[in-house]
């Protein structure tokens, strides 16, 4: 049986990390694409030369033309401008929307059967635009945000409680931005809910609130520390987990930016909610009960995403 083909659009820090992780997991053959000549070829060769040491057998190639992604089973899109200190994800909209138009056309022509994972910011608006530009089925085009935001939430909680990250479950709803909604009520440590852990005296509500704010500021915190770039290890790992769920039909329950057509009372918008991810792409959107406060925060987040989509339409009326 032929190996799966995974195309990576954008060969920056996330793209290179994705390629290496795919090789280590032997998920499939890799095509690194970038408009900058030499960049994808150099990274592909460098990673390929590590394969005898790490003991993996996959093909890694670099390319500057979209023909190279033809027939890809999975396409992961990281192309675009990354944040710099002082910038919000929303500041990238105008530049990265034009990139999504080009990428969407390339996917539409050469990889129309692929499962597409978008990482480019501002995430929710970019994946919404990418689906429209590519014309691919909505359940086959998703955004990577919730897995990353939830991983940050889980990590910070594990540090607070001094327990293994494996025993912490948590997830984040809404857009990938300052209005994201970390759900405390649905988050657990060893099956014990966070509100119960507060009652048990393991932590305080004040500390939980501080963690929530740190989750919302997670990307900016790393941008501020790096100064010349943004996060790439955790975003890449998050996207790989999604690609693996699709390629191996694992039926993972994960939060992703997916198209909503009435779920949660939201229509024609991509926003982060829990889904079942398998060989059919988004196979099911999971609607959880939200209390009044959670619902209000979620609606605020959705409205922030809708404003970004309206800004996209103002730039590219064809998206309407």
From Swiss-Prot:
It comes from the Bacteria. Its EC number is 1.1.1.37. InterPro entries: L-lactate/malate_DH, Lactate/malate_DH_C, Lactate/malate_DH_N, Lactate_DH/Glyco_Ohase_4_C, Malate_DH_type3, NAD(P)-bd_dom_sf. It is an enzyme of class 1 (oxidoreductase). It catalyses: (S)-malate + NAD(+) = oxaloacetate + NADH + H(+). GO terms for biological process: lactate metabolic process; tricarboxylic acid cycle. NAD(+) binds at residues 10-15, 34, 96, 119-121. Keywords: NAD, Oxidoreductase, Tricarboxylic acid cycle. One of its GO terms (molecular function) is L-lactate dehydrogenase activity. It holds the Pfam family Ldh_1_C. Belongs to the LDH/MDH superfamily. MDH type 3 family. This is Malate dehydrogenase. It comes from Bartonella quintana (strain Toulouse). The lineage of its organism: Bacteria, Pseudomonadati, Pseudomonadota, Alphaproteobacteria, Hyphomicrobiales.
């Amino acid at each position: 049986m032929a190996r799966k083909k995974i195309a990576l659009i954008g060969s920056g820090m996330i793209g290179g990390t994705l390629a290496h992780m795919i090789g280590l997991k032997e998920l499939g053959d890799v095509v690194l694409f970038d408009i900058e000549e030499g960049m994808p070829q150099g990274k592909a060769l460098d990673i390929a030369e590590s394969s005898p040491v790490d003991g993996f057998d996959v093909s890694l190639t670099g390319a500057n033309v979209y023909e190279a992604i033809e027939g890809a089973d999975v396409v992961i899109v990281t192309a675009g401008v990354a944040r710099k200190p002082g910038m919000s994800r929303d500041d990238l909209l105008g530049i990265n929307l034009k990139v999504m138009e080009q990428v969407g056309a390339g996917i539409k022509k050469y990889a129309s059967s692929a499962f597409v994972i978008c990482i480019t910011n501002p995430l929710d608006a970019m994946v919404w635009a990418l689906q429209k530009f590519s014309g691919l089925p909505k359940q086959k085009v998703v955004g990577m945000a919730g897995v990353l935001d939830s991983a940050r939430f889980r990590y910070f909680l594990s540090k607070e409680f001094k327990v293994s990250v494996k025993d912490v479950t948590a997830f984040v709803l809404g857009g990938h931005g300052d209005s994201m909604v970390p759900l405390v009520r649905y988050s657990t440590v060893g099956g014990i809910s966070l509100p119960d852990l507060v009652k048990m005296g393991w932590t305080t509500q004040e500390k939980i609130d501080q963690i929530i704010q740190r989750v919302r500021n997670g990307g900016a915190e790393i941008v501020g520390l790096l100064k010349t770039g943004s996060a790439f290890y955790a975003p890449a790992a998050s996207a790989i987990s999604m690609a693996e769920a699709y390629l191996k039909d694992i039926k993972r329950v994960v939060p992703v930016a997916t198209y909503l057509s009435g779920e949660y009372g939201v229509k024609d918008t991509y926003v982060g909610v829990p889904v079942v991810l398998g060989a059919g792409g988004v196979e099911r959107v999971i609607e959880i009960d939200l209390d009044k406060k959670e619902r209000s925060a979620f609606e605020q987040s959705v409205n922030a995403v809708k404003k970004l989509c309206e800004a996209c339409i103002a730039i590219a009326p064809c998206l309407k």
